[in-house]
């Protein structure tokens, strides 16, 4: 049965599965739906039009579903959707969307979100990501599956971080990071710059030597040649056309991502 601490305040209109746990002094609002096996730690707030899936663990002092920090917001009924089996640690803040975008902030499943993380309005976070402590992403940011954000990193609004990419700790990111790429600060300051393909991460995820070699070639064309962006994109397209089926899949993801950039690619 649902375990609600006597000091918790759960609105009668909230929909909680039979085995949800709500800790001491926590607050659950009227438009909240929480799935089976999810636990809410002490002193946390879950509010807004928020849907949380199954098996999530929300730590103490988290604020989930708060109103967006956007001066254009006028109390529209925007949403936050969270998937399954996520860990959301203490003092994390996750806000609902705005009508200026899709009206929803989306968190996938199996994400590891550490302490003091901020996920702003209208963000889209995939599956199996890691947000190290104090990572902060501004509004409208997209984070792909298996991406890793280092501690105390900051991401500018509307930036995209591709699948399997990695952002180093204490880095400031203002442009898109292609899939499979490492971006981190360097000796010249905290602005994130490209640092190669995330080879170790790809090996751990089961990518083979041919796939990694193809991505390294694409990276060299984009970052280590004298080609313009359009010329590099065309050369990567030619590389994709010659690749076998296994190597082609990550190359296509890389090419499609850079072709769709609006803010430009991290340099």
From Swiss-Prot:
<dbReference type="InterPro" id="IPR037157">
    <property type="entry name" value="Acetyltransf_C_sf"/>
</dbReference>
<keyword id="KW-0963">Cytoplasm</keyword>
<dbReference type="GO" id="GO:0009245">
    <property type="term" value="P:lipid A biosynthetic process"/>
</dbReference>
<dbReference type="InterPro" id="IPR018357">
    <property type="entry name" value="Hexapep_transf_CS"/>
</dbReference>
<comment type="function">
    <text>Involved in the biosynthesis of lipid A, a phosphorylated glycolipid that anchors the lipopolysaccharide to the outer membrane of the cell.</text>
</comment>
<dbReference type="GO" id="GO:0005737">
    <property type="term" value="C:cytoplasm"/>
</dbReference>
<comment type="subunit">
    <text>Homotrimer.</text>
</comment>
<keyword id="KW-0808">Transferase</keyword>
<keyword id="KW-0441">Lipid A biosynthesis</keyword>
<comment type="similarity">
    <text>Belongs to the transferase hexapeptide repeat family. LpxA subfamily.</text>
</comment>
<keyword id="KW-0443">Lipid metabolism</keyword>
<keyword id="KW-0012">Acyltransferase</keyword>
<dbReference type="InterPro" id="IPR029098">
    <property type="entry name" value="Acetyltransf_C"/>
</dbReference>
<keyword id="KW-0677">Repeat</keyword>
<protein>
    <recommendedName>
        <fullName>Acyl-[acyl-carrier-protein]--UDP-N-acetylglucosamine O-acyltransferase</fullName>
        <ecNumber>2.3.1.129</ecNumber>
    </recommendedName>
</protein>
<dbReference type="InterPro" id="IPR001451">
    <property type="entry name" value="Hexapep"/>
</dbReference>
<dbReference type="InterPro" id="IPR010137">
    <property type="entry name" value="Lipid_A_LpxA"/>
</dbReference>
<dbReference type="InterPro" id="IPR011004">
    <property type="entry name" value="Trimer_LpxA-like_sf"/>
</dbReference>
<dbReference type="Pfam" id="PF00132">
    <property type="entry name" value="Hexapep"/>
</dbReference>
<dbReference type="GO" id="GO:0008780">
    <property type="term" value="F:acyl-[acyl-carrier-protein]-UDP-N-acetylglucosamine O-acyltransferase activity"/>
</dbReference>
<dbReference type="Pfam" id="PF13720">
    <property type="entry name" value="Acetyltransf_11"/>
</dbReference>
<dbReference type="GO" id="GO:0016020">
    <property type="term" value="C:membrane"/>
</dbReference>
<comment type="pathway">
    <text>Glycolipid biosynthesis; lipid IV(A) biosynthesis; lipid IV(A) from (3R)-3-hydroxytetradecanoyl-[acyl-carrier-protein] and UDP-N-acetyl-alpha-D-glucosamine: step 1/6.</text>
</comment>
<keyword id="KW-0444">Lipid biosynthesis</keyword>
């Amino acid at each position: 049965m649902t375990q609600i601490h006597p000091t918790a305040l759960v609105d009668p209109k909230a929909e909680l599965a039979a085995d949800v746990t709500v800790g001491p002094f926590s607050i659950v609002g009227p438009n909240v739906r929480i799935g089976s096996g999810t636990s809410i730690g002490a002193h946390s707030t879950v509010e807004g039009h928020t849907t949380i899936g199954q098996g999530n663990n929300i730590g103490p002092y988290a604020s989930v579903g708060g109103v967006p920090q956007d001066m254009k917001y006028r109390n529209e009924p925007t949403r936050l959707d969270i998937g399954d089996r996520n860990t959301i640690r203490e003092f994390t803040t996750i806000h609902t969307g705005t009508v200026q975008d899709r009206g929803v902030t989306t968190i996938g499943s199996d994400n590891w979100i550490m302490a003091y993380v901020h996920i702003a309005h209208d963000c889209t976070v995939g599956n199996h990501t890691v947000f190290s402590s104090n990572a902060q992403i501004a509004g409208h940011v997209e984070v792909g599956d298996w991406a890793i954000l280092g501690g105390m990193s900051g991401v500018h609004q509307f930036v995209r971080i591709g699948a399997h990419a990695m952002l180093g700790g204490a880095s400031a990111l203002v442009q898109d990071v292609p899939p499979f790429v490492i971006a981190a600060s360097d000796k010249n300051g905290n602005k994130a710059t490209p640092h190669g393909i995330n080879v170790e991460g790809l090996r751990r995820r089961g990518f083979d030597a041919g796939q990694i070699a193809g991505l390294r070639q694409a990276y060299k064309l984009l970052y280590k040649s004298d080609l313009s962006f359009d010329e590099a994109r065309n050369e990567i397209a030619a590389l994709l056309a010659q690749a076998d089926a296994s190597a082609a899949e990550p190359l296509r993801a890389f090419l499609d991502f850079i072709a769709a950039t609006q803010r430009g690619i991290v340099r």
